[in-house]
Swiss-Prot record:
InterPro entries: KOW (IPR005824), Rib_uL2_dom2 (IPR014722), Ribosomal_uL24 (IPR003256), Ribosomal_uL24_CS (IPR005825), Ribosomal_uL24_KOW (IPR041988), Translation_prot_SH3-like_sf (IPR008991). NCBIfam families: rplX_bact. The lineage of its organism: Bacteria, Pseudomonadati, Pseudomonadota, Gammaproteobacteria, Oceanospirillales. This is Large ribosomal subunit protein uL24. GO terms for biological process: translation. CDD domains: KOW_RPL26 (cd06089).
Length: 102
């Protein structure tokens, strides 16, 4: 189970986009994430007149490995680690630095 979920604010800690922050748009099954505005690639799209799509070069987000990102803690303004604990019989994620629930 990944500790990062959709709509979490993250920061990239390794790779060409190190230091960039963004929101998780999608979590893929293979341990990869798609983050808004991070790891942008140019994709060549072929025109399809049947669908009415125009061809050209489109810039879009590519996936990142989850090990290259850390969750962003807004209180401390730093990257943080996530832990799990049970509160009232429910599994809750929390920041390891200050113990605050996500």
């Amino acid at each position: 189970m990944l500790k990062i979920k959709r709509d979490d604010e993250i920061i990239v800690i390794a790779g060409k986009d190190k230091g960039k922050r963004g929101s998780v748009q999608q979590v893929l099954d293979n341990g990869r994430l798609i983050v808004a505005g991070v790891n942008m690639v140019k994709k060549h799209v072929k025109a399809n007149p049947n669908r009415g799509t125009q061809g050209g070069i489109v810039e879009q987000e590519a996936s990142l490995n989850a090990s290259n990102v850390a969750i962003w803690n807004p209180k401390t303004q730093k990257a943080d680690r996530v832990g799990f604990r049970f509160e009232d019989g429910k599994k809750v994620r929390f920041f390891k630095s200050n113990g605050e629930a996500l």
